[in-house]
Structures are given as C-alpha cells and as structure tokens.
C-alpha cells in the first residue's frame, strides 16, 4: 500500500513539474500537418485547442471530422532584408568552396543564407529598397 501511495505522489509531483516547465521555444512557425486522405480515420475529437494538448504539440485536424494533439511541423520564420547583390562572373569558374548554409535559419542573428560568388554563405542582408 505504501508503494502505491508513493507512486501516486511521485506522479502528481511529476505532473506539476511538467505543468510549470517553460514552453519549448523553437524558432519558426508551428503548423499542423496536412489532413489525412484516408477514409479509415475514425471521427474522434481528442482536443479542443492547443492549450488542451501536452507541451510540444498542437491541436490539429487529422481528418474532416477528427482533431488530435499532434507534433507540429516547423516552418522557419523568414528573416528581414534581402541578399546582397553579387556580380555574375564573366566566364565559368571552378568553385572549390563548400556551402556554409542552405536556409536563413542556419545563420546566426539577422544574417541570411545568400549566394556569394560560388557558394552559399551567411551574410548581412541589404535593408535598402531595391533599385527600379
């Protein structure tokens, strides 16, 4: 009997600790995956909104008649500015450099992932309006 009481108290303490834990801060926008096209999905509503889901999940439509807590897809937030202008080479050149990035979210601070002569680099963005 003591074991069950201790186990119950431990579970209550764990639940309280998880409820007080700070939200997971991930860069980007959390979006729900696409709806399932399967006609076999049962019509079950297991959540009402994101607040009714465990931390790190969202309340998403899984089919036209069901909602459940789901791990969201993260879409990177676009960074401000645009990549600096790089003149094109007059003749093809061999590039021995390796790419440093492939997306803006792989660059620190406000830097953007931009083409720089022959490879992708994290560069400071141009914030001026483009010439017309």
From Swiss-Prot:
Q: What's the gene?
A: WAP
Task: Answer whether the UniProt record assigns the keyword Signal to this protein.
Answer: yes
Protein function: Could be a protease inhibitor. May play an important role in mammary gland development and tissue remodeling.
A GO molecular-function annotation? serine-type endopeptidase inhibitor activity
GO CC annotations on file? extracellular space
- The protein's name in its UniProt record: Whey acidic protein
Chief location of this protein within or outside the cell:
secreted
The record's annotation in CDD domains points to: WAP (cd00199)
Tissues where the protein occurs: Milk-specific; major protein component of milk whey.
Q: Which InterPro entries match?
A: Elafin-like_sf, WAP_dom, WAP_four-disulfide_core
Q: Name one GO biological process term.
A: antibacterial humoral response
Please give one Pfam family short name.
WAP
Residue stretches making up the WAP domain: 23-73, 76-126
Establish whether keyword Disulfide bond is in the entry: yes
Annotated keywords = Disulfide bond, Milk protein, Protease inhibitor, Repeat, Secreted, Signal
């Amino acid at each position: 009997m003591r074991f069950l009481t201790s186990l119950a108290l431990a579970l209550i303490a764990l639940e309280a600790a998880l409820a007080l834990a700070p939200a997971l801060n991930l860069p980007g926008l959390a979006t729900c995956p696409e709806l399932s096209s399967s006609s076999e999905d049962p019509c079950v509503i297991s959540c009402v909104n994101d607040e009714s889901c465990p931390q790190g999940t969202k309340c998403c439509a899984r089919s036209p008649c069901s909602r459940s807590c789901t791990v969201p897809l993260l879409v990177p937030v676009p960074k401000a500015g645009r990549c600096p202008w790089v003149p094109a080479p007059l003749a093809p050149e061999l590039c021995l450099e390796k790419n440093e990035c492939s997306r803006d979210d792989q660059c620190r601070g406000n830097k953007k992932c931009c083409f720089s002569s022959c490879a992708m680099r994290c560069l400071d963005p141009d914030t001026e309006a483009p010439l017309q």
